[in-house]
């Protein structure tokens, strides 16, 4: 079943002026109005049964594993039709709007292992990639882009404040304009332990980053030889209720 989306980003004059000043092809495409004809979407999810193990008079859950994957493809049907072409940027259009063409795959693996009644270890790995091609020669649309940082990702950075690649600078005060990408790799390892009946402590390590699929002015393209040294690492301690 095809899903049709019209991405209409309402940009303030100041925001548009900043885009014009940056003159970045990648960002201009990511924040442009686009017609998205989603050719197909597929999802897969697996979760094992959590078995209980006894320790004296009490019982606790053993290892729990979950995996889910999501695949999206867009623009291929419209590209096959190739209606009208915008002579200014060379893109084909539908309803006078350039349409996006890409494939995107996102994977998430989670392992939770109870060590004893008062402690557990948690591991998470995520990897995703989107490939813009055909009618989209620069980047994924904003709605399908990846970002890094935040409480559910790399906790050493604010949400959308990490990357892409070795890029170190924020060109906007809100730190959201430039920190998007087409590829994401990340993992976290966390040890949780009881500090009482309602309070738990957590020691964690997070690693990961985002990259662009194509080369851009920020030198943020994903390259195997640079991947390890461009990984961002954070470690810390937290409290959970």
Please report, for each region that a protein language model flagged, where it lies by residue.
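C-terminal outer-membrane beta-barrel translocator/porin domains of Gram-negative envelope proteins
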Residues: 1-193, 204, 211-213, 220
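C-terminal beta-signal and terminal closure region of outer-membrane beta-barrel proteins
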Residues: 148-156, 217-241
